[in-house]
Amino acid sequence: MKRFACVYVWLLCLVLSIAAQEKVVKLKIVQTSDVHGNYYPYNFITRKDWQGSLARIYAFVEKEREQYKENLILLDNGDILQGQPTAYYYNYIDTVSPHLCAEMMNYMKYDAGNMGNHDVETGRAVFDRWINTCDFPVLGANIIDISTGEPHLPPYKVMERDGVKIVILGMITPAIPAWLSENLWKGLRFDDMEETARKWMKIIREKENPDLMIGLFHAGQEAFKMSGKYNENASLSVAKNVPGFDIVLMGHDHARECKKVMNVAGDSVLVIDPASNGIVLSNIDVTLKLKDGKVRSKDIKGVLTETKDYGISEDFMKNFAPQYDLSLIHI
């Protein structure tokens, strides 16, 4: 009997030891991009109900957080400050209250944001105020403060979930000077995305050694030279030519995309773009298998999800009802 008891204890210890060494971590990554002021499911320009909006996006996020909890990572890829009159009102009319967009994104618990060209277009007074009100970092590795030569915004964010280290590198299309007057972005410059990605990938690998590397790029898919010198829409170029990215989240061009590409090192990279106005979102499942604390395998799958299929978040609408009513009065 003693022998059987010893064997049982030994087997139990063995099973527990194996269980402690092996682990599966599941992450849900949700990307919004080019929301363009569509905070409510109502178009204040046409005075009609709207199929997109942060209110619909949050209905999806609420549902998914029931399962994933802190393992849901919510990211925005820029161009959120301009498009609907509600955004204009808090950009230029009510400049004393906390910016509505920042309040909404804080309420939704975004983990990181990114700058878009239309966010820059609002002017430094507006976008700096919005950034300073956000409870999460707004990224911009290639937005450089001319006086210091350093990024004006955090270049990347480091997160850890269930022992998995995640790094998100944010960049914007460098073609801002081709569209926007310098008085809107005075004191800044916008560096080439591929050059910036190479620089920061080296730093990130040496300093952070991430298990999952995400690019959050406000740039589209088909690269071309704008005004003869700016590499516009370089997201795919970076995904293919700069090894190290597992996922590249795209925006800016309002074109839906979800596919895998192979980079120059022979590794697969998921590239995904949810187009605009909060009508669809990037919905990514990542499964990582760890052994002895190290990632042994990664499975990454992405789809574009229609937000209309999840209804409207009642909690969101209730929380921001006063601002909605105010918008109806003043717009």
Question: Which residues are covered by each model-predicted region?
Answer:
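Bacterial Sec-dependent N-terminal signal peptides
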Residues: 1-23
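Intrinsically disordered, low-complexity N-terminal regions enriched in serine/proline/glycine
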Residues: 3-7, 109, 323
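Generic hydrophobic, helix-prone segments enriched in Leu/Val/Ile
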Residues: 90, 323-326
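Acidic, Ser/Thr/Pro-rich beta/coil linker or hinge segments at domain junctions
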Residues: 307-315
